C-alpha cells in the first residue's frame, strides 16, 4: 500500500461521512479505516482475503447470530447487495447510504439495525 497517497486522499474527505474503499483487480478488500460487510438476501459476506481483519470485525464474527461467508466481492456486483456496512474501532458500525460513483443505493437497514444492537452491548 502507498501510505502517503492514502493519507493524502483521507485529508481531502470527511472521514465521518465518507470512506475510501480499497480494491485489487475489481475485488473489494477493505476501507481505509474500516472493514466491510455486505448483505444480500439477509446473508452476510466479507472479502475472501487480502485485508486486515480488524478488532471490531473479529468481535462481531464471534457475537452476532449470523454466519458470515468469505467470498470475492466484485465491484461489478455491488448492485446485488442491499446493505454495505463499515465496521471499525473508530466508526463502530455504520450503514453506507450510497456510493454515487457506482450508482449503488442502500435498500434496507435490517441487518445494520441487528448488528448495531449487538455491537452496542459492548459500548
Show where each model-derived region lies.
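Helix-start/capping segments and mature chain N-termini
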Residues: 1-123
Amino acid at each position: 500500500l502507498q501510505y502517503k497517497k492514502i493519507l493524502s486522499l483521507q485529508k481531502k474527505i470527511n472521514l465521518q461521512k465518507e470512506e475510501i474503499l480499497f480494491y485489487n483487480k475489481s475485488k473489494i478488500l477493505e476501507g481505509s479505516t474500516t472493514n466491510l460487510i455486505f448483505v444480500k438476501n439477509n446473508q452476510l459476506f466479507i472479502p475472501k482475503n487480502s485485508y486486515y481483519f480488524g478488532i471490531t470485525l473479529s468481535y462481531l464474527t464471534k457475537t452476532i447470530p449470523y454466519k458470515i461467508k468469505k467470498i470475492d466481492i466484485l465491484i461489478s456486483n455491488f448492485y446485488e447487495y442491499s446493505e454495505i456496512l463499515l465496521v471499525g474501532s473508530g466508526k463502530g458500525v455504520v450503514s453506507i447510504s450510497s456510493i454515487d460513483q457506482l450508482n449503488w443505493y442502500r435498500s434496507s437497514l435490517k441487518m445494520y439495525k441487528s448488528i448495531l444492537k449487538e455491537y452496542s452491548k459492548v459500548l
